[in-house]
């Protein structure tokens, strides 16, 4: 018997997504398309008449603004919001700011494929000479982190390792207590939660790429195990395309 509902949404397209650049912890703004995606997702939540008691997001504006849009459109702007670096996107280290073509030219296509598709191989670290080192590592939003907590690069495994404790210690107890939760975050931090909920293998989660801006609904039992497959919210065409895109990701290219 279903006892809980969880809604998650990956932020709308950012300006750096649009330019095909590795974004990671760089605080990119939503693109026009991304802002529209957030509005569409918000409207889908409104149409489904879903209410929230508490929301969680990262400390990066593309996720925060997506959340704001949802709360605005659904007239729930008063709902408490918790922001945490633990829900940030994967830190792409030395690749941050490069587009895929530049990265392939610099490091070789095979190496880039390993960084993108390997579960536990991190990209090269972001050193102090990197263009974005100061704007990320020295930003005051991270002033409270211990030196060992502040990454210079992350694999997907690393990203999940810092996101999951927050899920286990903060979010899961709220859901079990009956709170209706919305998480607006990033492709890789949300992958960590999906992997945990569904007990997916390392390989399977690497092949799952969550669509931007489309709310994902989970019905969970009292042990927070899904009672049904993840469900997308939106008009029929949007949902069909999202489901096809997710299904196709498991197939050989």
Curated annotation (Swiss-Prot):
Q: Where does substrate bind?
A: 10-17, 23-24, 62, 89-92, 100, 116-117, 187-188
Active site (record annotation): 11 (tele-phosphohistidine intermediate), 89 (proton donor/acceptor)
For the modification Phosphoserine, which residues carry it? 14, 118, 135
Sequence positions bearing Phosphothreonine: 3, 121, 152
**GO CC aspect terms:** cytosol
Q: Which GO terms describe its biological process?
A: canonical glycolysis; gluconeogenesis; glycolytic process; Notch signaling pathway; response to mercury ion; spermatogenesis; striated muscle contraction
Give the EC number(s) listed in the UniProt record. Answer: 5.4.2.11, 5.4.2.4
Name positions with the PTM Phosphotyrosine: 132-133
What molecular function does GO assign, one term?
Answer: bisphosphoglycerate mutase activity
- Name the residues annotated as site: Transition state stabilizer: 186
Please tell me in which tissues this protein is expressed.
Expressed in the testes (at protein level).
Catalysed reaction equations from the record: (2R)-2-phosphoglycerate = (2R)-3-phosphoglycerate; (2R)-3-phospho-glyceroyl phosphate = (2R)-2,3-bisphosphoglycerate + H(+)
Q: InterPro entries annotated for this entry? A: His_Pase_superF_clade-1 (IPR013078), His_PPase_superfam (IPR029033), PG/BPGM_mutase_AS (IPR001345), Phosphogly_mut1 (IPR005952)
EC class of the enzyme, as a word: isomerase
Q: Which UniProt keywords apply?
A: Glycolysis, Hydrolase, Isomerase, Phosphoprotein
Subunit organization:
Homodimer. Interacts with ENO1.
HAMAP family, A to Z: PGAM_GpmA
For this chain, the family text in UniProt reads: Belongs to the phosphoglycerate mutase family. BPG-dependent PGAM subfamily.
Quote the NCBIfam families the UniProt record gives: pgm_1 (TIGR01258), PRK14115.1 (NF010713)
Q: State the protein's purpose.
A: Interconversion of 3- and 2-phosphoglycerate with 2,3-bisphosphoglycerate as the primer of the reaction. Can also catalyze the reaction of EC 5.4.2.4 (synthase), but with a reduced activity.
Can you name this protein? Phosphoglycerate mutase 2
What is the species listed in this Swiss-Prot or TrEMBL entry?
A: Mus musculus
Ranked from the top, the taxonomy reads: Eukaryota, Metazoa, Chordata, Craniata, Vertebrata
């Amino acid at each position: 018997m279903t006892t809980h509902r969880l809604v998650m949404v990956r932020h709308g397209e950012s300006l750096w997504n649009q330019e095909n650049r590795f974004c990671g912890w760089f605080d990119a703004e939503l693109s026009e398309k991304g802002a529209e995606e957030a509005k569409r997702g918000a409207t889908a939540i409104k149409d489904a008449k879903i209410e929230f008691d508490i929301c969680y997001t990262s400390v990066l504006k593309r996720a925060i603004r997506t959340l704001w849009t949802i709360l605005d459109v659904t007239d729930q702007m008063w709902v408490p919001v918790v922001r945490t670096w633990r829900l940030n996107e994967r830190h792409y280290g030395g690749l941050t700011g490069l587009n895929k073509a530049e990265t392939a030219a610099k490091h070789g296509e095979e190496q880039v494929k390993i960084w993108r598709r390997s579960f536990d191989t991190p990209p090269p670290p972001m050193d102090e000479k990197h263009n974005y080192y100061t704007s990320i590592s020295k930003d005051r939003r991270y002033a409270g982190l211990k030196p060992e907590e502040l990454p210079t690069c992350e694999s997907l495994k690393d990203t999940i390792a810092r996101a999951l404790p927050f899920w286990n210690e903060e979010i899961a107890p709220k859901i079990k207590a009956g709170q209706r939760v919305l998480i607006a975050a990033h492709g890789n931090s949300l992958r960590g939660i999906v992997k945990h909920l569904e007990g997916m293998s390392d390989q399977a989660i690497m092949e799952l790429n969550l669509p931007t801006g489309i709310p994902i609904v989970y019905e969970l039992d009292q042990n927070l195990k899904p009672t049904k497959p993840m469900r997308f919210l939106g008009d029929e065409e949007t949902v069909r395309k999202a489901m096809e895109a997710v299904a196709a990701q498991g197939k050989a290219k």
